[in-house]
């Protein structure tokens, strides 16, 4: 188990519809006023990161979508310590533009911007905005070149790069970022994991059981070690923390009972089609059931559903298999982020301290 405290991030609801494809009431709003307050509450609660979403088209409840980089900057302006991860989609974005945008925001916010490189899974979105749709592994090859380009632009003067997708000739960006913005990515395919093991600082996995997550962590870390690279792991989880386990399970049942079948099935078809395009025929949602797909990132599978004590124990179990960060979604963001900070996070820190004391005693 890592001696570093597990970190916490939350999904920013900068698109409408919340994080579940359900008709259940979600006391969550996609507007900037709601999100500014949410960012401040999350910062006070002990969250280190917030992750904005990137969507160009409506679908599956997300009728309205704020652009991720501009929205990230607005949240950074409303906080003082929170790091915000801006989602960027290669294709619509070019590395030079992204590098300059992020370097400027980094300068303006004392180094608190990070980036999530989204390789793309929704073919219809690319077609709608006139972007060429690459085959599965080609999308990850492009993303890797995008990341290598960002790193080069941020760290070198007269940067020169000859790739299949991007080329630079003696390009110098000034000013550069204050430090090196962290680079995140997701994906469960072989191509995604191999990319993380070569170039990314962080790898997000979809929700899964502790055993399933351990298998992914072990695979990626072994590959990274062979590449003399280090990568940290974040896991998706939809958190339902209530005073009793019965209350939490009842909320989960209500979410699923009130799911929008047409939207869930349409999302599932698009997501699984993207996964089947990988050489191994799998992706993030290959084994997801209808109930799993009600939450976009398989967040129910991680099972952070129950009392604060139960959830804290499960988070520490995730940490024990190599998870460095929990990326949390909620039904009612503001009130539940606050509850999480008051009731769950202190228990996590207490359990971490006990585990550290036990390790110290064993060494002694």
From Swiss-Prot:
Pfam families: Bac_luciferase
Disulfide bonds: none
Primary gene name: sfnG
Its biological purpose: Involved in the dimethyl sulfide degradation pathway. Catalyzes the oxidation of dimethylsulfone (DMSO2) to yield methanesulfinate, which is oxidized spontaneously to methanesulfonate in the presence of dioxygen and FMNH(2).
Keywords: Flavoprotein, FMN, Monooxygenase, Oxidoreductase
Classification via InterPro entries: DMSO2_SphG, Luciferase-like_dom, Luciferase-like_sf, SsuD_RutA_monooxygenase
Keyword hit for Transferase: no
Keyword Repressor carried by entry: no
The protein, known as: FMNH(2)-dependent dimethylsulfone monooxygenase
Family: Belongs to the SsuD family.
EC id: 1.14.14.35
Organism of origin: Pseudomonas fluorescens (strain Pf0-1)
Catalytic activity, as annotated: dimethyl sulfone + FMNH2 + O2 = methanesulfinate + FMN + formaldehyde + H2O + 2 H(+)
Classification via CDD domains: Alkanesulfonate_monoxygenase
One of the GO biological process terms: alkanesulfonate catabolic process
GO molecular function term, any single one: alkanesulfonate monooxygenase activity
Recorded superkingdom: Bacteria
């Amino acid at each position: 188990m890592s001696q570093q405290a597990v970190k916490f991030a939350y999904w920013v609801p900068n698109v409408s519809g919340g994080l579940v494809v359900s008709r259940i009431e979600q006391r969550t709003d996609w507007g900037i006023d709601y999100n500014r307050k949410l960012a401040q509450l999350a910062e006070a609660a002990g969250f280190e990161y917030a992750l904005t979403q990137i969507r160009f088209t409506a679908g599956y409840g997300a009728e309205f979508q704020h652009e991720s980089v501009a929205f990230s900057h607005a949240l950074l302006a409303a906080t003082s310590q929170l790091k915000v991860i801006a989602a960027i989609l290669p294709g619509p974005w070019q590395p030079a533009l992204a590098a300059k945008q992020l370097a400027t925001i980094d300068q303006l916010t004392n180094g608190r911007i990070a980036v999530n490189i989204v390789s793309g899974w929704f073919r219809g979105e690319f077609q709608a905005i006139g972007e060429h749709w690459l085959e599965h592994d080609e999308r990850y090859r492009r993303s890797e070149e995008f990341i290598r380009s960002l790193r080069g632009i941020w760290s070198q003067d007269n940067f020169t790069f000859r790739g299949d997708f991007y080329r630079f000739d003696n390009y110098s960006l000034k000013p550069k970022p204050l430090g090196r913005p962290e680079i995140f990515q997701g994906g469960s395919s072989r191509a995604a994991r191999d990319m993380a093991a070569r170039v990314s600082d962080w790898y997000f996995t979809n929700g899964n059981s502790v055993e399933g997550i351990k298998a992914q962590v072990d695979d990626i870390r072994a590959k990274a070690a062979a590449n003399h690279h280090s990568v940290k792991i974040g896991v998706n989880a939809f958190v339902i923390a209530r005073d009793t386990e019965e209350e939490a399970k009842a909320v989960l049942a209500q979410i699923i009972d009130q799911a929008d079948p047409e939207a869930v099935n349409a999302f599932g078809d698009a997501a699984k089609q993207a996964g089947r395009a990988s050489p191994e025929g799998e992706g993030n949602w290959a084994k997801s059931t209808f109930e799993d797909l009600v939450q976009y990132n398989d967040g129910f599978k991680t099972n952070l559903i129950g009392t604060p004590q139960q959830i804290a124990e499960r988070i520490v179990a995730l940490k024990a298999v190599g998870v460095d960060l929990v990326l949390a979604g909620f039904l009612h963001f503001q009130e539940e982020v606050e509850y999480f900070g008051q009731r769950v996070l202190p228990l996590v820190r207490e359990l971490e301290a006990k585990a550290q004391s036990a390790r110290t005693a064993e060494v002694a």
